[in-house]
Amino acid sequence: MTKPAADASAVLTAEDTLVLASTATPVEMELIMGWLGQQRARHPDSKFDILKLPPRNAPPAALTALVEQLEPGFASSPQSGEDRSIVPVRVIWLPPADRSRAGKVAALLPGRDPYHPSQRQQRRILRTDPRRARVVAGESAKVSELRQQWRDTTVAEHKRDFAQFVSRRALLALARAEYRILGPQYKSPRLVKPEMLASARFRAGLDRIPGATVEDAGKMLDELSTGWSQVSVDLVSVLGRLASRGFDPEFDYDEYQVAAMRAALEAHPAVLLFSHRSYIDGVVVPVAMQDNRLPPVHMFGGINLSFGLMGPLMRRSGMIFIRRNIGNDPLYKYVLKEYVGYVVEKRFNLSWSIEGTRSRTGKMLPPKLGLMSYVADAYLDGRSDDILLQGVSICFDQLHEITEYAAYARGAEKTPEGLRWLYNFIKAQGERNFGKIYVRFPEAVSMRQYLGAPHGELTQDPAAKRLALQKMSFEVAWRILQATPVTATGLVSALLLTTRGTALTLDQLHHTLQDSLDYLERKQSPVSTSALRLRSREGVRAAADALSNGHPVTRVDSGREPVWYIAPDDEHAAAFYRNSVIHAFLETSIVELALAHAKHAEGDRVAAFWAQAMRLRDLLKFDFYFADSTAFRANIAQEMAWHQDWEDHLGVGGNEIDAMLYAKRPLMSDAMLRVFFEAYEIVADVLRDAPPDIGPEELTELALGLGRQFVAQGRVRSSEPVSTLLFATARQVAVDQELIAPAADLAERRVAFRRELRNILRDFDYVEQIARNQFVACEFKARQGRDRI
């Protein structure tokens, strides 16, 4: 028989060693015996015994031989028995180096798994490609060390329980040796259920829950466990490419960010928190880790996605399905919390959406703290000296789901997930080209930095802990936003939405977009490759054409030159793309509105400017992320630095403010923020004669009706603000202003709030008129240039 390759770590050095051989076939035992013969030849004075390691679910009788080998009296003296070294050994089988994508899929078929070949296949491999067989040894441990660990960590007392503990430790050591050869992407937690159920810590917590049983906890662990397999890991990239086949096959990464994250993951476990715009995000993160040969992530997902064949397959590739609405189930909450803690303690990486659900508006939602609090508990309990919160920005040139999101905005119901839904989803990915997927990894946030050292003060102060969690989560989300590149899709959609259905030519699109690109360059904001191409007319044409055919732009070719516009029915879809870039223009838009407000203010206009900037920040805090108030003021001051002696000119007011705004490039507030204040104003109008404690559903229904009336009357500029999604945050604003609760002066305050919003919309009109004057002047200059030619 041809000799297989042996791992460099598979060398025995102790004087008395018990080799635990994990084998499935006689072929594997032959290979291990051959390897053991080499060890004996190298160390003729050492004692090597070999015992077949019982399988995981073996009956108690199968452990008898191991129990005897572990008994102190089995060796020549009790002390020498305790000093005996235990070394687990296994044969691993590597897949063919030239395996195709089809071969990875075929591995799901019975008898085609390259990692677990049949005995007949093993003999053929040894004849034709013996290097595919590797004898590996796990880390050794003395019997005394294992016995101490067993006593310290488990509730068991019987010698057979100790043998089971040693067996589990052997399998875990072999798993670590295996992924060192296969690669970090195959790293996964093993034997989670038996390890946790045997844990003294876990049992102690279980005893504190009334009516809780080990059996029920075990069933919940079965539900949570991933059942990881190498074949499923290989399929992650295949399925990921299938689900995203409408996009460029190569994801767009920042290689410096990837290198920094690789170094960070070598030092600490991490939670990868990704922005969530599409179901595709769930495959983007695992594929991104595989692309860059990084350790895998164990993704949390709703149990509603565990259907058909996809459920088992996704479990085996690292998906952890969790139940919804677990507040009334203390046992499930406890098991989930301990499961998260166990995975973190074993230095495996977790991942979920920081927003908790897909953002159907295109902008980031507030972070959810549920799972984060479990990770924080694990950290504060000392299960890791630090845990990194690694943000992941995922953005797309286009998404087919925007049609669905537009329907939600108009009041449609969510489509339930299932096999038919999955088929239609994957089918839609291949209907056209959606551009690129951009994945960014901003600098990670340290849990230690925000929560202090483990076992610190926060463990005894729930309120302080929650505040620290909120600040930490917002910092992660803020870093995600700062790393998210601005796309051509977002810029073109934002521009065309401002025309309210009026078409623009290629030249008009091109020259108007340049101010935005100049601003992004000055701010050194990240931009996508598609946005960089907007510097050329060809790049603008490509971006506009990619959005054409109602996706969501309409192109008209019947005249002298093509023109592009957004039809009213497509405004909600286009808004998704526009909203995805607002973060890059948020503060400069607030500057414009604060200047417009100061123009009409009495008294100290500089003070009025700052007061209005902070007021706008407060009103928009439910829709957007902001820097803290000190940093925000500094950012606003920096935005104003483009105008020399701006405070002096602002103090003069009148035409000076007109000139300041006319000189500002670009003017973005109307394009970026108007629709949100129109939605707020619709809700404020509904509240004028609504009951004090009106419910959210009734308020939304009334706002939809009134909003449609306002559209018909031209009292709002488009149908875009008539959106259930925008009304949801508008209600939050009203609650924050204490306008949905009984009070003596409620009616007066509701009227005053509506008046305030109308004044802000008046400021939008003022800025919009100046922006229109800029556009006309630019058009006139461009025509003069063309006429001279």
Curated annotation (Swiss-Prot):
Domain of life, per lineage: Bacteria
Protein family (similarity comment): Belongs to the GPAT/DAPAT family.
SUPFAM superfamilies xrefs: Glycerol-3-phosphate (1)-acyltransferase
Keywords: Acyltransferase, Cell membrane, Lipid biosynthesis, Lipid metabolism, Membrane, Phospholipid biosynthesis, Phospholipid metabolism, Transferase
EC number(s) recorded for this UniProt protein: 2.3.1.15
Main location (coarse class): membrane
Miscellaneous field: Was identified as a high-confidence drug target.
Localization per record: Cell membrane
Organism placement in taxonomy: Bacteria, Bacillati, Actinomycetota, Actinomycetes, Mycobacteriales
Motif (HXXXXD motif): 276-281
Name of this chain's protein: Glycerol-3-phosphate acyltransferase
GO terms, biological process: CDP-diacylglycerol biosynthetic process
Source organism: Mycobacterium tuberculosis (strain ATCC 25618 / H37Rv)
Associated pathway: Phospholipid metabolism; CDP-diacylglycerol biosynthesis; CDP-diacylglycerol from sn-glycerol 3-phosphate: step 1/3
A Pfam family of this chain: GPAT_C
GO molecular function, one term: glycerol-3-phosphate O-acyltransferase activity
A GO-annotated cellular component: plasma membrane
Domain notes: The HXXXXD motif is essential for acyltransferase activity and may constitute the binding site for the phosphate moiety of the glycerol-3-phosphate.
Membrane topology (UniProt): Peripheral membrane protein
Catalytic activity: sn-glycerol 3-phosphate + an acyl-CoA = a 1-acyl-sn-glycero-3-phosphate + CoA
